[in-house]
Amino acid sequence: MSPLVAVLVFFSAALGVPGTGVAGNPHGLDAIFEPPVTPAPPTRAPRREELEWDDEDHPLLGLEPPVGSRCHPYIAYSLPPDMTAVTSVVVKPYCSPPEVILWASGTAYLVNPFVAIQALAIGEPLNEAALKELGEVAVHKDSLPPLRYNGGPPAE
């Protein structure tokens, strides 16, 4: 077989052109590459809201990150309308450990690193039983819209 014919046979097999194949690969490139992975279904992302810092009574204005933590500037979220019990949440995912601050109507803020992250990630309602066990927030259902702003110092 001439070198030119050998090169043509090699590339035709590699590109999937029917033929003898190359090195045990009768299907060309289709057999080399694995089939694409089916992407996970999209989740409902929380809405990001603009931060406002003209309210001197806002509970987070004096909140400092834990000593020694590497925190990204605070990220503010409003819960999707079908989530109940808590009206707003601030997630600081780059802290170690991550911090989540939840509000329920008429209560102070609550720091909890697990419940809200799971709810936001999978788009399911917050686990009210888990919040009740913490004893720091009045868990109830309401129809109030998310707060206009909800936490953290302004990004520089």
Curated annotation (Swiss-Prot):
This protein's encoding gene: gL
Membrane topology, as annotated: Peripheral membrane protein
Subunit architecture: Interacts with glycoprotein H (gH); this interaction is necessary for the correct processing and cell surface expression of gH. The heterodimer gH/gL seems to interact with gB trimers during fusion.
Family: Belongs to the herpesviridae glycoprotein L (gL) family. Alphaherpesvirinae gL subfamily.
Pfam families: Herpes_UL1
Lineage top rank: taxon: Viruses
Alphabetical list of HAMAP family matching this protein: HSV_GL_alphagamma
Protein name: Envelope glycoprotein L
Residue ranges annotated for the gL alphaherpesvirus-type domain, each copy included: 50-156
UniProt function note: The heterodimer glycoprotein H-glycoprotein L is required for the fusion of viral and plasma membranes leading to virus entry into the host cell. Acts as a functional inhibitor of gH and maintains gH in an inhibited form. Upon binding to host integrins, gL dissociates from gH leading to activation of the viral fusion glycoproteins gB and gH.
GO cellular component terms given for this protein: host cell Golgi apparatus; host cell plasma membrane; membrane; viral envelope; virion membrane
Post-translational modification: O-glycosylated, and sialylated.
Region (Interaction with gH): 21-141
Leader sequence residues: 1-16
Keyword field: Disulfide bond, Fusion of virus membrane with host cell membrane, Fusion of virus membrane with host membrane, Glycoprotein, Host cell membrane, Host Golgi apparatus, Host membrane, Membrane, Signal, Viral envelope protein, Viral penetration into host cytoplasm, Virion, Virus entry into host cell
UniProt xrefs under PROSITE patterns: GL_AHV
Keyword Membrane listed: yes
Location (main, coarse): virion
GO biological process: fusion of virus membrane with host plasma membrane; symbiont entry into host cell
Annotated compartments: Virion membrane; Host cell membrane; Host Golgi apparatus, Host trans-Golgi network
Disulfide bonding pattern of the chain: C71-C95
